[in-house]
Amino acid sequence: MLINHLIVVLLISLVGTGGAEDDGLCSADQKSCAQSEPDQINEDEFSFKIRRQIEKANADYKPCSSDPQDSDCSCHANVLKRDLAPYKSTGVTRQMIESSARYGTKYKIYGHRLYRDANCMFPARCEGIEHFLLPLVATLPDMDLIINTRDYPQLNAAWGNAAGGPVFSFSKTKEYRDIMYPAWTFWAGGPATKLHPRGIGRWDQMREKLEKRAAAIPWSQKRSLGFFRGSRTSDERDSLILLSRRNPELVEAQYTKNQGWKSPKDTLDAPAADEVSFEDHCKYKYLFNFRGVAASFRLKHLFLCKSLVFHVGDEWQEFFYDQLKPWVHYVPLKSYPSQQEYEHILSFFKKNDALAQEIAQRGYDFIWEHLRMKDIKCYWRKLLKRYVKLLQYEVKPEDQLIYIGPKKDEL
Protein backbone atom coordinates (compact mmCIF):
# COMPACT_ATOMS: atom_id res chain seq x y z
CA MET A 1 0.00 0.00 0.00
CA LEU A 2 2.81 2.35 0.88
CA ILE A 3 4.50 1.68 -2.45
CA ASN A 4 1.27 2.34 -4.38
CA HIS A 5 0.75 5.59 -2.48
CA LEU A 6 4.26 6.75 -3.34
CA ILE A 7 3.72 5.98 -7.03
CA VAL A 8 0.50 8.02 -7.09
CA VAL A 9 2.19 10.97 -5.38
CA LEU A 10 5.07 10.81 -7.84
CA LEU A 11 2.73 10.80 -10.85
CA ILE A 12 0.76 13.78 -9.49
CA SER A 13 4.01 15.61 -8.89
CA LEU A 14 5.23 15.02 -12.46
CA VAL A 15 1.94 16.14 -14.01
CA GLY A 16 1.90 19.23 -11.81
CA THR A 17 5.31 20.41 -13.05
CA GLY A 18 3.94 21.07 -16.53
CA GLY A 19 6.68 19.04 -18.23
CA ALA A 20 8.45 20.51 -21.23
CA GLU A 21 6.34 23.67 -21.49
CA ASP A 22 7.48 24.99 -18.13
CA ASP A 23 11.09 24.27 -19.11
CA GLY A 24 10.78 26.79 -21.91
CA LEU A 25 10.34 24.12 -24.61
CA CYS A 26 7.38 23.74 -26.94
CA SER A 27 6.05 20.32 -27.91
CA ALA A 28 5.29 19.64 -31.56
CA ASP A 29 1.49 19.63 -31.13
CA GLN A 30 1.22 22.89 -29.21
CA LYS A 31 -0.54 25.67 -31.09
CA SER A 32 1.31 28.34 -29.11
CA CYS A 33 3.90 28.51 -26.43
CA ALA A 34 4.54 31.56 -24.29
CA GLN A 35 8.14 32.75 -24.32
CA SER A 36 9.90 32.50 -21.02
CA GLU A 37 10.50 35.79 -19.27
CA PRO A 38 14.04 37.15 -19.71
CA ASP A 39 16.37 36.67 -16.79
CA GLN A 40 15.92 39.43 -14.28
CA ILE A 41 18.99 41.10 -12.84
CA ASN A 42 19.57 43.28 -9.87
CA GLU A 43 20.41 46.62 -11.48
CA ASP A 44 22.35 47.86 -8.47
CA GLU A 45 24.51 44.73 -8.40
CA PHE A 46 25.05 44.88 -12.16
CA SER A 47 26.02 48.55 -11.99
CA PHE A 48 28.41 47.89 -9.10
CA LYS A 49 30.05 45.04 -11.00
CA ILE A 50 30.59 47.11 -14.16
CA ARG A 51 31.94 50.06 -12.20
CA ARG A 52 34.41 47.82 -10.38
CA GLN A 53 35.63 46.34 -13.66
CA ILE A 54 36.17 49.80 -15.12
CA GLU A 55 37.94 51.06 -12.00
CA LYS A 56 40.21 48.01 -11.76
CA ALA A 57 41.09 48.02 -15.46
CA ASN A 58 42.08 51.67 -15.35
CA ALA A 59 43.99 51.30 -12.08
CA ASP A 60 45.99 48.42 -13.58
CA TYR A 61 46.52 50.09 -16.95
CA LYS A 62 50.01 51.24 -17.89
CA PRO A 63 50.61 53.20 -21.10
CA CYS A 64 52.43 51.09 -23.64
CA SER A 65 55.12 53.72 -24.28
CA SER A 66 56.85 56.31 -22.13
CA ASP A 67 57.47 58.32 -25.30
CA PRO A 68 54.35 60.36 -26.13
CA GLN A 69 55.30 60.20 -29.82
CA ASP A 70 56.12 56.45 -29.63
CA SER A 71 58.67 57.05 -32.38
CA ASP A 72 59.85 53.41 -32.46
CA CYS A 73 56.33 51.86 -32.38
CA SER A 74 57.19 50.14 -29.10
CA CYS A 75 53.49 49.82 -28.23
CA HIS A 76 53.19 46.86 -30.56
CA ALA A 77 56.61 45.26 -29.93
CA ASN A 78 55.33 42.42 -27.74
CA VAL A 79 53.15 41.12 -30.55
CA LEU A 80 55.93 40.54 -33.05
CA LYS A 81 58.16 39.01 -30.36
CA ARG A 82 55.40 36.57 -29.44
CA ASP A 83 54.62 35.71 -33.06
CA LEU A 84 58.27 35.01 -33.92
CA ALA A 85 58.96 33.03 -30.72
CA PRO A 86 58.04 29.57 -32.15
CA TYR A 87 60.94 29.88 -34.61
CA LYS A 88 63.55 31.14 -32.17
CA SER A 89 64.90 27.67 -31.33
CA THR A 90 64.66 26.15 -34.81
CA GLY A 91 65.36 29.09 -37.06
CA VAL A 92 63.85 29.20 -40.55
CA THR A 93 65.26 26.84 -43.17
CA ARG A 94 64.87 26.76 -46.93
CA GLN A 95 62.85 23.55 -46.59
CA MET A 96 60.41 25.27 -44.22
CA ILE A 97 59.86 28.07 -46.72
CA GLU A 98 59.33 25.62 -49.58
CA SER A 99 56.85 23.52 -47.60
CA SER A 100 54.90 26.64 -46.61
CA ALA A 101 54.66 28.12 -50.11
CA ARG A 102 51.22 26.58 -50.64
CA TYR A 103 49.81 28.73 -47.84
CA GLY A 104 50.35 32.10 -49.47
CA THR A 105 52.17 34.29 -51.97
CA LYS A 106 55.95 34.04 -52.04
CA TYR A 107 57.84 37.32 -51.79
CA LYS A 108 61.59 37.69 -52.06
CA ILE A 109 63.84 40.60 -51.21
CA TYR A 110 67.10 40.10 -53.06
CA GLY A 111 69.76 42.68 -53.81
CA HIS A 112 67.46 45.42 -52.44
CA ARG A 113 64.79 44.53 -54.97
CA LEU A 114 61.34 43.04 -54.39
CA TYR A 115 60.06 39.98 -56.28
CA ARG A 116 56.99 37.77 -55.88
CA ASP A 117 55.02 34.90 -57.40
CA ALA A 118 53.57 35.80 -60.79
CA ASN A 119 50.09 34.86 -59.65
CA CYS A 120 48.63 36.82 -56.76
CA MET A 121 45.27 35.49 -55.60
CA PHE A 122 44.05 39.00 -54.71
CA PRO A 123 45.91 41.66 -56.73
CA ALA A 124 44.54 44.61 -54.74
CA ARG A 125 45.66 42.97 -51.51
CA CYS A 126 49.14 42.41 -52.91
CA GLU A 127 49.17 46.08 -53.91
CA GLY A 128 48.38 47.04 -50.32
CA ILE A 129 51.20 44.85 -49.00
CA GLU A 130 53.72 46.04 -51.58
CA HIS A 131 53.00 49.66 -50.74
CA PHE A 132 54.66 49.05 -47.37
CA LEU A 133 57.38 46.64 -48.52
CA LEU A 134 58.81 48.68 -51.39
CA PRO A 135 60.11 51.63 -49.32
CA LEU A 136 61.90 49.16 -47.01
CA VAL A 137 63.81 46.98 -49.48
CA ALA A 138 66.72 49.41 -49.81
CA THR A 139 67.55 48.92 -46.12
CA LEU A 140 66.80 45.21 -45.73
CA PRO A 141 68.97 42.13 -46.31
CA ASP A 142 67.92 39.28 -48.59
CA MET A 143 64.97 37.18 -47.39
CA ASP A 144 62.08 34.96 -48.47
CA LEU A 145 58.54 35.52 -47.16
CA ILE A 146 55.31 33.58 -47.48
CA ILE A 147 52.50 36.13 -47.12
CA ASN A 148 48.95 34.87 -46.84
CA THR A 149 46.43 37.21 -48.51
CA ARG A 150 43.40 35.08 -47.66
CA ASP A 151 41.05 36.15 -44.89
CA TYR A 152 41.83 33.11 -42.77
CA PRO A 153 45.11 32.13 -41.02
CA GLN A 154 46.83 28.95 -42.16
CA LEU A 155 48.94 27.30 -39.45
CA ASN A 156 47.03 25.51 -36.71
CA ALA A 157 49.12 25.56 -33.54
CA ALA A 158 47.92 22.05 -32.68
CA TRP A 159 50.02 20.76 -35.56
CA GLY A 160 53.19 21.98 -33.84
CA ASN A 161 56.28 22.02 -36.03
CA ALA A 162 54.46 19.79 -38.50
CA ALA A 163 52.38 22.83 -39.41
CA GLY A 164 55.34 24.20 -41.33
CA GLY A 165 55.74 27.89 -41.56
CA PRO A 166 56.48 30.61 -41.07
CA VAL A 167 53.49 32.20 -42.78
CA PHE A 168 52.47 35.85 -42.45
CA SER A 169 48.73 36.51 -42.00
CA PHE A 170 46.84 39.68 -41.12
CA SER A 171 44.65 38.10 -38.43
CA LYS A 172 44.49 35.00 -36.27
CA THR A 173 43.21 33.45 -33.06
CA LYS A 174 45.29 31.79 -30.34
CA GLU A 175 44.77 28.50 -32.15
CA TYR A 176 47.11 29.60 -34.95
CA ARG A 177 50.84 30.30 -35.13
CA ASP A 178 50.82 32.58 -38.16
CA ILE A 179 52.87 35.77 -37.87
CA MET A 180 50.61 38.82 -37.96
CA TYR A 181 51.40 41.71 -40.27
CA PRO A 182 49.53 45.02 -40.79
CA ALA A 183 46.67 44.27 -43.16
CA TRP A 184 46.68 45.42 -46.78
CA THR A 185 43.64 47.57 -46.01
CA PHE A 186 45.81 50.23 -44.43
CA TRP A 187 46.51 51.13 -48.07
CA ALA A 188 44.30 49.14 -50.50
CA GLY A 189 42.32 45.97 -51.08
CA GLY A 190 39.71 46.11 -48.33
CA PRO A 191 36.11 44.91 -48.76
CA ALA A 192 34.44 46.40 -51.83
CA THR A 193 31.13 48.12 -51.06
CA LYS A 194 28.87 50.64 -52.75
CA LEU A 195 30.57 53.39 -50.79
CA HIS A 196 34.01 51.92 -51.48
CA PRO A 197 33.72 50.19 -54.87
CA ARG A 198 37.49 49.76 -55.15
CA GLY A 199 37.73 48.44 -51.61
CA ILE A 200 38.27 50.05 -48.22
CA GLY A 201 41.79 51.46 -47.94
CA ARG A 202 43.85 54.61 -47.51
CA TRP A 203 43.87 54.65 -43.73
CA ASP A 204 45.82 57.91 -43.87
CA GLN A 205 42.93 59.67 -45.62
CA MET A 206 40.24 58.00 -43.53
CA ARG A 207 41.95 59.10 -40.32
CA GLU A 208 41.73 62.73 -41.39
CA LYS A 209 38.09 62.44 -42.48
CA LEU A 210 36.99 60.80 -39.25
CA GLU A 211 38.97 63.20 -37.09
CA LYS A 212 37.15 66.13 -38.70
CA ARG A 213 33.78 64.40 -38.46
CA ALA A 214 34.26 63.55 -34.79
CA ALA A 215 35.17 67.16 -34.05
CA ALA A 216 32.00 68.34 -35.83
CA ILE A 217 29.73 66.09 -33.73
CA PRO A 218 30.63 66.47 -30.05
CA TRP A 219 29.47 63.88 -27.53
CA SER A 220 26.47 65.94 -26.43
CA GLN A 221 25.13 66.02 -29.99
CA LYS A 222 25.45 62.30 -30.68
CA ARG A 223 22.32 60.16 -30.67
CA SER A 224 22.04 57.93 -27.60
CA LEU A 225 21.55 54.79 -29.65
CA GLY A 226 23.47 51.61 -30.22
CA PHE A 227 24.40 51.44 -33.90
CA PHE A 228 25.53 48.77 -36.33
CA ARG A 229 25.44 48.49 -40.08
CA GLY A 230 27.03 45.60 -41.94
CA SER A 231 26.43 42.36 -43.76
CA ARG A 232 25.53 39.03 -42.17
CA THR A 233 28.95 37.40 -42.37
CA SER A 234 28.23 35.76 -39.02
CA ASP A 235 25.01 34.92 -37.18
CA GLU A 236 26.69 36.26 -34.05
CA ARG A 237 25.24 39.62 -35.11
CA ASP A 238 21.62 38.40 -35.24
CA SER A 239 20.57 39.16 -31.67
CA LEU A 240 21.53 42.83 -32.02
CA ILE A 241 19.55 43.08 -35.27
CA LEU A 242 16.52 41.46 -33.63
CA LEU A 243 16.79 43.75 -30.63
CA SER A 244 16.79 46.74 -32.97
CA ARG A 245 13.54 45.54 -34.53
CA ARG A 246 12.00 45.03 -31.09
CA ASN A 247 13.35 48.19 -29.48
CA PRO A 248 14.37 50.77 -32.11
CA GLU A 249 14.62 53.48 -29.46
CA LEU A 250 17.60 51.63 -27.98
CA VAL A 251 19.41 50.21 -31.01
CA GLU A 252 19.55 51.02 -34.71
CA ALA A 253 21.07 47.93 -36.35
CA GLN A 254 20.40 46.51 -39.81
CA TYR A 255 21.98 44.13 -42.28
CA THR A 256 23.29 45.27 -45.66
CA LYS A 257 23.89 43.17 -48.75
CA ASN A 258 27.18 41.46 -49.35
CA GLN A 259 28.48 39.66 -52.43
CA GLY A 260 26.67 36.47 -51.46
CA TRP A 261 23.25 38.11 -50.95
CA LYS A 262 20.43 36.29 -52.78
CA SER A 263 17.20 37.11 -50.91
CA PRO A 264 15.85 38.75 -47.73
CA LYS A 265 16.66 35.49 -45.92
CA ASP A 266 20.30 36.56 -46.16
CA THR A 267 19.42 39.70 -44.20
CA LEU A 268 17.36 37.88 -41.57
CA ASP A 269 14.03 38.11 -43.42
CA ALA A 270 14.12 41.85 -43.97
CA PRO A 271 15.03 44.07 -46.92
CA ALA A 272 18.71 44.91 -47.10
CA ALA A 273 19.53 48.30 -45.62
CA ASP A 274 21.65 50.94 -47.29
CA GLU A 275 25.27 51.19 -46.30
CA VAL A 276 26.30 53.95 -43.91
CA SER A 277 29.63 55.73 -44.23
CA PHE A 278 32.14 55.55 -41.41
CA GLU A 279 31.74 59.31 -41.04
CA ASP A 280 28.01 58.92 -40.37
CA HIS A 281 28.69 56.30 -37.70
CA CYS A 282 29.95 59.27 -35.68
CA LYS A 283 26.36 60.45 -35.18
CA TYR A 284 25.83 57.69 -32.60
CA LYS A 285 27.19 57.29 -29.07
CA TYR A 286 27.41 53.49 -29.04
CA LEU A 287 29.03 51.58 -31.90
CA PHE A 288 29.20 47.79 -32.18
CA ASN A 289 32.00 45.75 -33.70
CA PHE A 290 31.84 42.06 -34.59
CA ARG A 291 34.25 39.67 -36.22
CA GLY A 292 33.54 38.75 -39.82
CA VAL A 293 35.22 35.78 -41.46
CA ALA A 294 38.23 36.86 -39.40
CA ALA A 295 39.00 40.12 -37.58
CA SER A 296 36.85 43.03 -38.72
CA PHE A 297 38.40 45.87 -40.71
CA ARG A 298 35.71 48.10 -39.18
CA LEU A 299 37.14 48.29 -35.66
CA LYS A 300 39.90 50.86 -36.08
CA HIS A 301 37.53 53.24 -37.87
CA LEU A 302 34.92 53.16 -35.11
CA PHE A 303 37.30 54.46 -32.45
CA LEU A 304 38.00 57.62 -34.43
CA CYS A 305 34.37 58.72 -34.09
CA LYS A 306 35.00 59.37 -30.38
CA SER A 307 32.01 57.09 -29.76
CA LEU A 308 31.92 54.26 -27.24
CA VAL A 309 32.96 51.02 -28.95
CA PHE A 310 31.38 47.71 -27.90
CA HIS A 311 33.67 44.92 -29.11
CA VAL A 312 31.93 41.53 -29.29
CA GLY A 313 34.20 38.51 -28.79
CA ASP A 314 37.95 38.59 -28.26
CA GLU A 315 39.09 35.57 -30.26
CA TRP A 316 40.21 37.29 -33.46
CA GLN A 317 43.22 39.58 -33.35
CA GLU A 318 45.12 42.00 -35.53
CA PHE A 319 48.61 43.18 -34.66
CA PHE A 320 47.40 46.31 -32.86
CA TYR A 321 44.62 44.74 -30.74
CA ASP A 322 46.97 43.66 -27.97
CA GLN A 323 47.32 47.14 -26.48
CA LEU A 324 43.62 47.98 -26.72
CA LYS A 325 42.43 47.18 -23.21
CA PRO A 326 38.86 46.22 -22.22
CA TRP A 327 37.10 48.78 -20.04
CA VAL A 328 39.95 51.23 -20.71
CA HIS A 329 39.52 51.76 -24.45
CA TYR A 330 36.31 49.84 -25.21
CA VAL A 331 33.50 47.78 -23.69
CA PRO A 332 34.11 44.03 -24.04
CA LEU A 333 31.20 41.68 -24.69
CA LYS A 334 31.37 37.90 -24.87
CA SER A 335 30.63 36.15 -28.15
CA TYR A 336 26.94 35.77 -29.00
CA PRO A 337 25.41 38.19 -26.46
CA SER A 338 21.69 37.84 -25.88
CA GLN A 339 19.24 40.67 -26.50
CA GLN A 340 18.87 41.07 -22.73
CA GLU A 341 22.63 41.38 -22.27
CA TYR A 342 22.72 44.16 -24.86
CA GLU A 343 19.86 45.90 -23.08
CA HIS A 344 21.55 45.71 -19.69
CA ILE A 345 24.91 47.10 -20.80
CA LEU A 346 23.40 49.86 -22.93
CA SER A 347 21.11 50.85 -20.07
CA PHE A 348 24.11 51.10 -17.76
CA PHE A 349 26.04 53.45 -20.03
CA LYS A 350 23.00 55.56 -20.82
CA LYS A 351 22.71 56.15 -17.07
CA ASN A 352 26.47 56.70 -16.73
CA ASP A 353 27.10 59.05 -19.60
CA ALA A 354 30.34 60.52 -18.25
CA LEU A 355 31.90 57.05 -17.91
CA ALA A 356 30.91 56.23 -21.48
CA GLN A 357 32.49 59.41 -22.80
CA GLU A 358 35.73 58.80 -20.86
CA ILE A 359 36.17 55.32 -22.35
CA ALA A 360 35.30 56.63 -25.81
CA GLN A 361 37.94 59.36 -25.52
CA ARG A 362 40.63 56.91 -24.38
CA GLY A 363 39.84 54.62 -27.29
CA TYR A 364 40.09 57.50 -29.73
CA ASP A 365 43.36 58.71 -28.22
CA PHE A 366 45.01 55.31 -28.51
CA ILE A 367 44.14 54.78 -32.16
CA TRP A 368 44.95 58.37 -33.09
CA GLU A 369 48.34 58.27 -31.35
CA HIS A 370 49.46 54.69 -31.95
CA LEU A 371 47.93 53.58 -35.24
CA ARG A 372 49.34 56.22 -37.55
CA MET A 373 50.72 55.39 -40.97
CA LYS A 374 54.21 55.78 -39.56
CA ASP A 375 53.34 53.15 -36.94
CA ILE A 376 52.32 50.74 -39.72
CA LYS A 377 55.58 51.35 -41.58
CA CYS A 378 57.57 51.06 -38.37
CA TYR A 379 55.93 47.73 -37.50
CA TRP A 380 56.68 46.27 -40.93
CA ARG A 381 60.32 47.39 -40.64
CA LYS A 382 60.85 45.94 -37.16
CA LEU A 383 59.01 42.75 -38.04
CA LEU A 384 61.14 42.04 -41.11
CA LYS A 385 64.41 42.95 -39.42
CA ARG A 386 63.69 40.51 -36.60
CA TYR A 387 62.38 37.86 -38.97
CA VAL A 388 65.44 37.86 -41.25
CA LYS A 389 67.69 37.06 -38.29
CA LEU A 390 65.92 33.68 -38.07
CA LEU A 391 66.86 32.61 -41.60
CA GLN A 392 69.35 29.71 -41.60
CA TYR A 393 70.23 29.65 -45.30
CA GLU A 394 71.56 31.79 -48.12
CA VAL A 395 68.78 33.42 -50.13
CA LYS A 396 69.16 32.91 -53.87
CA PRO A 397 67.40 34.43 -56.91
CA GLU A 398 64.53 32.54 -58.57
CA ASP A 399 63.77 33.05 -62.25
CA GLN A 400 60.06 32.24 -61.90
CA LEU A 401 59.40 35.22 -59.63
CA ILE A 402 58.40 38.55 -61.16
CA TYR A 403 60.08 41.87 -60.42
CA ILE A 404 57.93 44.28 -58.40
CA GLY A 405 60.23 47.19 -57.70
CA PRO A 406 61.57 49.66 -56.96
CA LYS A 407 61.12 51.29 -60.34
CA LYS A 408 64.28 51.61 -62.41
CA ASP A 409 64.44 55.39 -61.94
CA GLU A 410 64.31 54.89 -58.17
CA LEU A 411 67.38 52.66 -58.02
Curated annotation (Swiss-Prot):
PROSITE patterns: ER_TARGET. Disulfide bonds join C64-C75, C73-C378, C120-C126, C282-C305. Changing A124F: Slightly decreased enzyme activity. It is found in: Endoplasmic reticulum lumen. Its EC number is 2.4.1.-. Changing T267I: Nearly complete loss of enzyme activity. Disruption phenotype: Flies exhibit a temperature-dependent loss of Notch signaling, resulting in bristle loss. Defects in muscle development. Changing S296A: Loss of enzyme activity. The record marks F122, R232, Q259 as: Interaction with the consensus sequence C-X-S-X-[PA]-C in peptide substrates. Residues 192-197 are annotated as: Interaction with the consensus sequence C-X-S-X-[PA]-C in peptide substrates. Residues 1-20 form the signal peptide. It is an enzyme of class 2 (transferase). It comes from the Eukaryota. This is O-glucosyltransferase rumi.
